[in-house]
């Protein structure tokens, strides 16, 4: 619990500095589906919600390279072939523009991995997602599973 509070404080300070400097952030995430059409979600040690896996794009790294790296680091997943681009979004959080890029991944191999960032991971049916699924994750999954129009945010 202390880590979550500390993370929130540090995150707010970083976001305030980014806002003052006019920095934008770029993220890369994946909707990973198994053969039963279940989606992979992760719960971080420092966040209360469940998310589709992914993270920030590093300097001189492509969004695709970032999602491949994050999937390997967070859940031990190696993508076979190419991830499919789903959409690019924009939202503002604490005054900072963030651009998450979402991919679809259906072909992969999994190895056992332990990440200090990940508290839990699991496969879920779209109709039976965890109660604490993040609002952004819910929007992305609704767009994917119901074919509703994709939003900008």
Name each model feature, range by range.
Residues 104, 113-145:
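NUDIX/MutT-family hydrolases
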Residues 1-29:
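Acidic, metal-coordinating catalytic segment for phosphate/diphosphate chemistry
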Residues 78-87:
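A short coil-to-beta-strand element that immediately follows conserved catalytic motifs
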Residues 89-112, 148:
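Active-site-adjacent beta-strand/loop module that shapes the phosphate/pyrophosphate-binding cleft
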Residues 31, 41, 102-104, 123:
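Conserved hydrophobic/aromatic beta-strand scaffold that supports enzyme active sites
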